[in-house]
Amino acid sequence: GGNIGTNAGGIKVIKYGMTRNWILGLTVVTGKGDILHLNKGMIKNATGYDLRHLFIGAEGTLGIVTEVQVKLERQPKNLTVMVLGVPKFTNIMQILSAFQSKMDLTAFEFFDDVAVDKLLATGHVQKPFETDAPFYALLEFEAPYEPIMDMAMQIFEDCMSEGWVLDGVMSQSIHQAQELWKLREYISETISVFTPYKNDISVLISRVPEFIADIDAIVSQNYPDFQVCWFGHIGDGNLHLNILKPENLSKDEFFEKCQVVNKYVFETVQKYNGSISAEHGVGMTKKPYLNYTRPDEEIDYLRAIKQVFDPNGIMNRGKIFD
């Protein structure tokens, strides 16, 4: 129910898409008490509005999911991981394009040197290679056959020749792949001690470099003592912005300043026609900022849909909008 309520995504969206891509049918109880059996597991069903998609991503505001029919997928074989050190953020986009043009990727993540420095300081993660880099790309792909590994190495060498990559490593075992994934998966826990101001945002993949440059400029101009840590699912345009609290600021002072940063960030999201919430939902925290992504006309339609399924407002009240 939680995955459906938020239309959950994650690190494999570039390959598998969002939760809604896998839901063949739903049984729900609406706020009116009606039991609806939506789509009933069918692949083809061209009989009007597909109501199941209203409940996916609705954050539980329309009804309660009681049963799900989910499409299954085979387990991937011989997942292989590459971590690449990258000199400029624009090079990450070029690397993504180079690999996607010739291979199917199961993940393509990025993180910056701030994240890596914090990770290495814990002693729980090993440096992937000796060369330092301002940005890092982590990509994953299935390699059940030797020619796929050869293709990946050829693309890597081409990227090196173009100057897009400073250094890199490719996993040779399941254990090494798991160790390389720690560079990405341990970031959130590691930076939590710095009381980060977090944002989960998205823009079109092609606009990511400009967007990040704009946000970095805004933060450095207005709050030069704030340290920014970036990571995210670059393969689908989902960025995790983290601003780390300076030691000389109290939590209250820091988060008061971050409320101003919020406005700058969401104005920039709006400028790029992006989303204030890529995968974590709106809930109560981002409710005041919904207009930065959704115009008034759309929000009016959302309220009208809510009224149809939950006229008494009993389902997860106070979330998304008032």
Regions picked out by a protein language model, each given a short descriptive name:
Residues 60, 241, 310:
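Conserved, mostly hydrophobic/aromatic
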Residues 1-109:
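FAD-binding subdomain of flavoenzyme oxidoreductases
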Residues 70, 74, 80-264, 268, ...:
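C-terminal substrate-recognition/cap domain of FAD-linked oxidoreductases
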Residues 24-44, 209-213, 248-260, 287-293:
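A short, flexible low-complexity segment enriched in Lys/Arg and Gly/Pro that occurs
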Residues 270-282, 311-315:
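Alpha-helix capping/hinge segments and adjacent helical runs
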Residues 114, 234-237, 276-288:
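Small/polar glycine-rich anion-binding or flexible loop at a beta-alpha turn
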Residues 35-56, 220-221, 259-273, 303:
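Short, hydrophobic/aliphatic alpha-helical segments
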Residues 34, 287-322:
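Activity-critical C-terminal alpha-helical subdomain
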